[in-house]
Structure formats: structure tokens, C-alpha cells
A protein has these predicted regions:
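Glycine-rich phosphate/ribose-binding loops and adjacent secondary-structure elements
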Residues: 165, 178, 182, 194-311
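C-terminal extensions of enzymes
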Residues: 1-18, 26-30, 42, 145-151, ...
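Hydrophobic alpha-helical packing residues
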Residues: 24, 164-171, 215, 244, ...
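C-terminal helical cap(s) of enzyme catalytic domains, especially alpha/beta-barrels
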Residues: 69-75, 285-299, 352-355, 364
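Glycine- and acidic
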Residues: 149-153, 158, 222-228, 337-340
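Structural signal for hydrophobic packing residues in well-ordered secondary-structure cores
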Residues: 137, 168, 172-175, 179, ...
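Non-catalytic, usually N-terminal nucleic-acid engagement modules in DNA/RNA processing proteins
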Residues: 1-189, 302-305
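Short, electropositive alpha-helical surface patch
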Residues: 154-169, 173-174, 207-218, 339, ...
């Protein structure tokens, strides 16, 4: 079996489980750092392991454009290419392609788009997205979907839902026919990647429910809720998640894509979400914004110039155990590359520790 979801304990709707994947086990609820271009920005892989990141994300769109999925396949797949022995989830590329707006053209077959790097023309279909992700060799592959923009009227959300469902079926058929082509070594004999379906439907609860129920009929090993954190208010995000979760199987992992702040991921985990990812901890770190037990800290603020306290007195991460706010502020103002490294290490540690505390809370 290439995916085994072992449910250990529940506390209300919250679930404590272990997700067994070809490249290791993942304790859920889990936060997944985003490694867009085969790199979690500013953090080397050995330090990701030291933070106890169990699974990271790779971005299909970016890796397809550079360095290319066939090159990565020929070098033994994404795990070997980036020297990451633990689990990897790749997105389908759909979100990035649909974010290109004027640079894309959508048809029933797929999406024609121009590269943001050099303007060259490319085409992504459900089948091509599967080919790219299988070549990358991720543990979890995402179905190619149409991400609905916000705001979108009901007719647009309905059209997007129907496209997503047709593309999910095409993704599944092509994936099932080619999943054994993953570039893994003989020690993974009999194991393959796993394909998750993605629920769309805009901000309409009934459309979300319908999409979830129709995806469940396709029998994916896991399900994601996509199209959130696209500009809608937090209350609406929460409402859509709460309305969608009951229509997804209790015995399979549930993944909410692209969320959120630390208090949000903790809230969603308590609602019954098993997996989450977000660029926020890494992106904010590069701009000097730190997440702490006392709230957000803009380390560039002048008031930290002589502050000898660690970034967070309640945090035991490798940064808080060694460096002061004054030093981190100095690195930012001097534009030292080390600033991004230390800030990112702390933020990721804070996010991962937030999920660890939620897991312990469910177990208690």
C-alpha cells in the first residue's frame, strides 16, 4: 500500500493520525513548508530535518519551467535531486497557471499559458500535469483543477466546479495508467505516488458540498479543499471549510491548501483538517516579520535595536536559543543574507510547534 491513514484519536471533530507514505510517516495534523523551486527559501535541507519537518511541498509549475521535470526524472526524481529523504507533496500547477491572468487561455483540454520567465508558450492539461508530477516522483500528487477567483458569481463558480470534476476524472485515469513510471529506486518496489482530488465551488457552500460528494465517488486516497485564501474574509474561509469537511470521508486525509496564519492553522486543525501549507512563514520572514507567542513582531522596528531578548521567550527553537532581537534587527537593516535564514528558521519552527501542540492537545 502506498498510503495508509491510521486514525489514533479524535477530540470533537479534530483528528490525530499518522499518514504512512512511500518516503516516510507524517504525524497529523501537519503543517507543510513550501519548497517552491525544490527549496524552502533560505533553509537548507539538513536544518529542515532538524526542525522536524515531515513533509514539504514542491511546485509543479515552477519545476516544469526550471530546471524541467525530465531533467529531474533523469537525476532520480525530486527527492534525490534536492537531497530530501522525507515525504513530498506537489501541487498540480493549476493555481499558478490561473494566477497568470492575461498570460493564459483556458479550453476544455487545458490551459495555454506563457512563462513568466521568458514569455515562451506552454500548455498544461490534466494529463500533462500528471506526467510532470510523476516525473518529479512526489509521494502525493494533486489533480489538475481550475482555481476559482474571488469574487466569482454563482455561474462562474458552477462552471469552474464542472471543469474541475471533468479534469479530476481525466487526472485519475491518466495517473492510474502511468503512476508506476515514478523515478524511485528498487527499494520502493510495489509503491507508487498517491493522487488527491481537489474540491472547488467558489464561496458557495452547496456547490462545495456537491463537488466534494462527486469527487468522493471517484474514490481518491485523499482530498483537498482548494480555492481558499484568495482574498475572501477569514470568516468565509472558516465557513467553507466547516461546510465541506462533513462531506469528505472520515477515514482519508483532508488537506486545506494555502492557509494561513498560525492561529488559523490551529483552528482548522481543531475543525478536523489534517494537512495545511502556506508560504506565509517563509515570505514574512524575508520581510522581517516574525510570528511569536505574543503575536507578530516586525523585527525591523527601531525599538528592538538594543533588545537582548530572544525573538520569543516561549520558543525553544535554534534561533531563540542563541540570538537576540537586536542581532536579528541588525541583520535586516544591514541586508545580510543571514537575516532571511534565521527569521525563516524561527517562523517555520513556530508553525511546526503550533501543530505539535495541537496534536498533543488532541491526544490529551
Amino acid at each position: 500500500m502506498s498510503l495508509d491513514f491510521q486514525l489514533h484519536k479524535t477530540s470533537g471533530p479534530a483528528r490525530r493520525a499518522t499518514l504512512l507514505l512511500p518516503h516516510g510517516q507524517v504525524e497529523t495534523p501537519v503543517f507543510m513548508p513550501v519548497g517552491t523551486a525544490a527549496s524552502v527559501k533560505a533553509v537548507p535541507q539538513n536544518l529542515l530535518e532538524a526542525l522536524d519537518a515531515q513533509i514539504i511541498l514542491g511546485n509543479t509549475y515552477h519545476l516544469y519551467l526550471r530546471p524541467g521535470h525530465e531533467l529531474i526524472r533523469n537525476l532520480g526524481g525530486l527527492h534525490r535531486f534536492m537531497s530530501w529523504p522525507r515525504a513530498i507533496l506537489t501541487d498540480s500547477g493549476g493555481f499558478q497557471v490561473f494566477s497568470l491572468n492575461e498570460l493564459r487561455k483556458v479550453t476544455e483540454n487545458g490551459v495555454e499559458f506563457r512563462s513568466h520567465l521568458d514569455g515562451s508558450s506552454h500548455f498544461f492539461s490534466p494529463e500533462h500535469s500528471m506526467d510532470v508530477q510523476i516525473a518529479l516522483g512526489s509521494d502525493i500528487v494533486m489533480a489538475f483543477d481550475e482555481c476559482t477567483e474571488y469574487p466569482a458569481d454563482r455561474a462562474r463558480a458552477r462552471h469552474s466546479l464542472e471543469t474541475t470534476l471533468r479534469w479530476a476524472d481525466r487526472s485519475r485515469q491518466h495517473f492510474d495508467a502511468h503512476k508506476h513510471e515514478r523515478p524511485w529506486g528498487p527499494e520502493f518496489a510495489g509503491q507508487t505516488p498517491n493522487l488527491f482530488g481537489i474540491v472547488q465551488g467558489g464561496m458557495y457552500s452547496d456547490l462545495r458540498r456537491e463537488c466534494a460528494e462527486r469527487l468522493v465517488e471517484m474514490d481518491f486516497p485523499g482530498y483537498a479543499i482548494g480555492g481558499l485564501s484568495v482574498g475572501e474574509p477569514r470568516e468565509l474561509t472558516c465557513e467553507i471549510i466547516a461546510e465541506t469537511l462533513p462531506h469528505l470521508p472520515a477515514d482519508k486525509p483532508r488537506y486545506v491548501m494555502g492557509v494561513g496564519y498560525p492561529d488559523e492553522i490551529a483552528e482548522y486543525a481543531r475543525m478536523g483538517v489534517d494537512m495545511m501549507d502556506c508560504v506565509l512563514p517563509t515570505r514574512a520572514a524575508r520581510h522581517g516579520l516574525l510570528f511569536t507567542s505574543e503575536g507578530r513582531v516586525n523585527i525591523k522596528n527601531r525599538k528592538y535595536a538594543a533588545d537582548q531578548n530572544p525573538p520569543d521567550l516561549a520558543c525553544s527553537c535554534m534561533v531563540c536559543g542563541r540570538y537576540s532581537r537586536a542581532y536579528l534587527r541588525h541583520l535586516m537593516t544591514a541586508q545580510e543574507p543571514l537575516a532571511a535564514v534565521l527569521n525563516t528558521l524561527h517562523n517555520l519552527a513556530f508553525y511546526l510547534d503550533t501543530m505539535r501542540r495541537v496534536r498533543e492537545e488532541i491526544e490529551a
